[in-house]
Every structure is written in structure tokens, then in C-alpha cells.
Amino acid sequence: ESIAYTPPGIIREDSGLGEKTIAKLIKASMKKLKIGFTSAKKVWDKRKKIQKITTGSKELDDLLSGGIETGGIIEFYGEFRTGKTQIMHQMCVNVQLPVEKGGVEGSALYIDTEGTFRPERIIQMTEALDLDHKQVLKNIVYGRAYNSDHQILMVKEASEIIKKRNIKLIVVDSLIGHFRSEYVGRGTLANRQQLINQHLHDLLRLCDIHP
């Protein structure tokens, strides 16, 4: 699946294989997965399987048409200290809730780029919901990304963890922080945007591979 969804240039960088070999691998992968055209009915059937995870706020859920959709990317942005990280902490708890309470009974993968993850805040949130904080913490897979390369690599290697740990939510907080600090000045802007674009596509690929 990863081969089918990965651009040839990225496979070449990671493996050192030639273009013809890569083309054959991608073609074989696509054939095996039956990637191509399909009917709108099948697209609709797939869309019906999308679930919503509550944010814990009725007003915010209403803005998001019922909560955060699985199988896609949502960006929260705003000024410093406006509660973005707190929402991400809450989502790591809420994703574990039963469906009837707004969750999807899954685990969370948290990629922390700024060192702002606080287990004690998770514990406070679990107490408010009368949950076992030890179990909730066990169901949050945590990784600290120290630079943009490390961050990109963690996302690329997330597929196995997603399968093993029933991951239904991936948090990257913050997604562009490292890129902003490492690629400074107009001369680096194009490269920075290209890397961010590819990073987002890697995340979207995970959504497709693990719906």
C-alpha cells in the first residue's frame, strides 16, 4: 500500500532504486490494490463509514458539522495561548470514548514538536469524564520530534504503529513550527513549502491506507 501511494521521487530517495524498477513496483502495487476508477456508489459507501469524534464542545462540534471526521486532516490555527494544544489533548481522550459518547473506541498517536504535551492535563480530563487515566495514557502513543526531518520520518514510519495500536487519531502539534524555524528567509520559502506539501501528502496517504 505504501508503495502504491508514494510518489516515485520519494521512493527513489529512500531506496536508491532506478526509475524503471520503481515504475514496475508502483504498477504492481496499484494492480494488487485495484487502484483506479470506481463508481460513485462505492465512493458513497466509503463516505458512509466516516466517523465523527467530538471535541467536547457543542459549539465547536456544530462548526465542524458534528465533530472531527476520521479519514481526513483538520488544522487548528490561531494566536499563541488560544487553546489549540488543549483541544489536541482533549481529542486524545475523546477518541477513546465509546461511539454513543462521541468517540470511536480508538487510540491516539501524538507527535510533539514543541515539547508541550502534558500527561497531567490528560489525567485531569479523564477525571472529568470518570475514565481510568492509566488506561487512557496507555492508549496514547507519544513521540517527540526534534526537527523537521525527524518529524517527517516519524510520519513515514507511523503505518506499523497505526495497525498494531488501533490508532484512530494522529496529532502533530505543531505541524509547521520546525519548518518555520529551520527555513528562514525568502530564498528558502519554495523548499519549505515543498517539504510541508509532501508532509501533508504523507499524512493524507495514512488516511487512505488506514481509513
List each language-model region with its residue ranges.
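Residue-level recognition of specific faces of alpha-helices
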Residues: S2, I73-E75, N139
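Conserved inter-motif catalytic segment of the P-loop NTP-binding fold
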Residues: G103-L189, H201-D202
